[in-house]
Amino acid sequence: MGLADDAPLGYLLYRVGAVLRPEVSAALSPLGLTLPEFVCLRMLSQSPGLSSAELARHASVTPQAMNTVLRKLEDAGAVARPASVSSGRSLPATLTARGRALAKRAEAVVRAADARVLARLTAPQQREFKRMLEKLGSD
């Protein structure tokens, strides 16, 4: 029995995150992005028009934290939100052309960082690992 057989899942995921997070952060830094900003760009590329509150729920962060991320991306010209909407509606966020290009570049550097971390596994192990993570993380 290996050490992993006896370790709690949260501990193992924390350790994987501790290896992956600095790799991804270093890859995103030259693009002027943080990991939360990349997550926001990725969510908006997959689901345009989400509000700040919806993005916060999907990212499991506070609405205040997501609003900070959105404001920075807006200031960078990557995200656009209307100045106002009809009564009772939240502001939908969308990627600008610059945001779509940035999201595409960010996706590429994040995948390269992923590949460096996953290099310890065979290709079939990588696919299975990602499949299992997707299953555990689905709603």
Curated annotation (Swiss-Prot):
Knockout mutant characteristics: Mutation of the gene leads to derepression and increased expression of htm. Inactivation of the gene confers resistance to the imidazo[1,2-a]pyridine-4-carbonitrile-based agent MP-III-71, an effective antimycobacterial compound that shows no cross-resistance to existing antituberculosis drugs.
Domain HTH marR-type, residue spans: 6-138
Secretion signal, residue range per the UniProt entry: none
Keywords, comma-separated and alphabetical: DNA-binding, Repressor, Transcription, Transcription regulation
Biological processes, Gene Ontology terms: regulation of DNA-templated transcription; response to stress
Residues reported in the UniProt entry to bind salicylate: 42, 114
GO molecular function, one term: DNA-binding transcription factor activity
Keyword Flavoprotein: no
Description of activity control: Binding of effector molecule SA, or its structural analog PAS, to the binding pocket of Rv2887 induces conformational change in its DNA binding domain, preventing binding to the promoter region of htm, triggering the expression of this SAM-dependent methyltransferase.
Pfam families: MarR
Subunit text: Homodimer.
Described purpose of this protein according to its UniProt entry: Represses expression of the HQNO methyltransferase htm gene (Rv0560c) by binding to its promoter region. Also represses the expression of at least five other genes, including the methyltransferase Rv0558. Binds salicylate (SA), para-aminosalicylic acid (PAS) and gemfibrozil.
Domain notes: Conformational changes take place in the N-terminal and the winged-HTH (wHTH) domain on ligand or DNA binding. SA and PAS stabilize a conformation of Rv2887 incompatible with DNA binding. Rotation of the N-terminal plays a key role in the dimerization.
Protein name as it appears in the record: HTH-type transcriptional repressor Rv2887
